[in-house]
Amino acid sequence: MALLEICCYSMECALTAQQNGADRVELCAAPKEGGLTPSLGVLKSVRQRVTIPVHPIIRPRGGDFCYSDGEFAAILEDVRTVRELGFPGLVTGVLDVDGNVDMPRMEKIMAAAGPLAVTFHRAFDMCANPLNTLNNLAELGITRVLTSGQKSDALQGLSKIMELIAHGDAPIIMAGAGIRAENLHHFLDAGVLEVHSSAGAWQASPMRYRNQGLSMSSDAHADEYSRYVVDGAAVAEMKGIIERHQAK
């Protein structure tokens, strides 16, 4: 049966995902940046309360995946922290200036991660040569790759995803970006074994007083009185679709 991973941005969201049938959580901060390293407090609280596998993302900033020496030092420190806290896996990725896997740096990450399952995140979708990159990741011992098939969403990239799956047995190819209940069947019918979804919705802030004349964001038009949360009903619906597909 296909595995359902849900991207979560808080302990509450991780618990919602778990309660509604998620098989695994990718734990992140900063949804508008595409996911950044969660705080130590969030990591500890999730580790204590969530019982399904949780893989934190290790990504120090938004933007590209070519990092300064200082940023890379922080990545290694965060990898060690996640390992010490007892998480079963993590999600990360580093490219060089030419859009290839930064092999020396990824080797250091793999050494720091030790026995943890490492997912190479959507840095893969920004690489120059996906098949060569997949070979490099297999050489490193990467467990899985999260990809949209190098398109803006995974449905558009499904043909590339299938090409990657056909390329070899390892790493596992996990489809992600824009996967919802209404298009999930396309991936299941294609034989994709792992799917990643935010199953998310924007929820209004509980604040009654709102200073509408001031923003804490560099984007003056950002809505600071809403929060991105996991929609438990959406998770349950996707899980049900997977189970019914398996029963066919």
From Swiss-Prot:
Transmembrane segments: none annotated. GO terms for molecular function: copper ion binding. GO terms for cellular component: cytoplasm. It is found in: Cytoplasm. Its main location: cytoplasm. Keywords: Cytoplasm. It comes from the Bacteria. Homodimer. Belongs to the CutC family. This is PF03932 family protein CutC.
